[in-house]
């Protein structure tokens, strides 16, 4: 029998008694966001909405985005990445397990030098794929042009956020490139490998 999302007590300022809210709701109130599934429209919209709300609530207080994401849809992922750049608060990104495909794209979007990977984390980068497998030739042609534009944008972001030369990014996005946490740090995808818990805690104060 599934356990479901645990509930925890929470007392809002001014309330005498605590109410029970689900775990993620409680964590969101502490500006701790979680991307722990494939990126789709629903999860991207939820996270973007939370980022806008938290930015309006306190533009000077950091947001922490914990990532364990195997990939997902390109357009919602690009939208989430752009929202991270648009809001005022710094967004710290923390890779807890895997950041693959669009998950790695969100990981690089964190505020530098506040992109963290846990020691066991794994990162994978590759190019965005088309969503058309069937359909008319016109659909395929239009989608191909769109994918090319998105690929160019993603390539530019990887170049800017990692410091790698364009030829390196172009080459690596043409295949699946897997990295350990330390390899991702050397590549420029993350800034810190939190091998020492004190390093990790410093970012979560």
From Swiss-Prot:
Organism name: Pinus contorta
GO biological process, one term: protein quality control for misfolded or incompletely synthesized proteins
GO cellular component: chloroplast stroma; endopeptidase Clp complex
The protein, known as: ATP-dependent Clp protease proteolytic subunit
Role summary: Cleaves peptides in various proteins in a process that requires ATP hydrolysis. Has a chymotrypsin-like activity. Plays a major role in the degradation of misfolded proteins.
GO molecular function, one term: ATP-dependent peptidase activity
Assigned keywords, A-Z: Chloroplast, Hydrolase, Plastid, Protease, Serine protease
Subunit architecture: Component of the chloroplastic Clp protease core complex.
Transmembrane segments: none
């Amino acid at each position: 029998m599934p356990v479901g999302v645990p509930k925890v007590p929470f007392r809002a300022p001014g309330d005498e008694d605590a109410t029970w809210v689900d775990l993620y709701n409680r964590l969101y109130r502490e500006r701790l966001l979680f991307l722990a599934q494939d990126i789709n429209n629903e999860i991207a919209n939820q996270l973007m909405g939370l980022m806008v709300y938290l930015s309006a609530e306190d533009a000077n207080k950091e947001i922490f985005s914990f990532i364990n994401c195997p990939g997902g849809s390109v357009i919602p992922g690009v939208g989430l990445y752009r929202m991270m750049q648009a809001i005022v608060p710094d967004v710290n990104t923390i890779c807890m397990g895997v950041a693959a495909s669009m998950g790695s794209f969100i990981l690089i979007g964190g505020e530098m030098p506040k992109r963290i990977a846990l020691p066991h984390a794994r990162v994978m980068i590759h190019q965005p794929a088309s969503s058309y497998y069937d359909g008319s030739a016109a659909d395929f042609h239009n989608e191909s042009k769109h994918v090319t534009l998105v690929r160019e944008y993603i390539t530019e972001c990887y170049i800017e956020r990692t410091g790698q030369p364009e030829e390196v990014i172009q080459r690596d996005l043409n295949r699946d490139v897997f990295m350990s946490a330390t390899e991702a740090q050397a590549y420029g995808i993350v800034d810190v490998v939190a091998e020492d818990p004190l390093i990790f805690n410093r970012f979560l104060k």
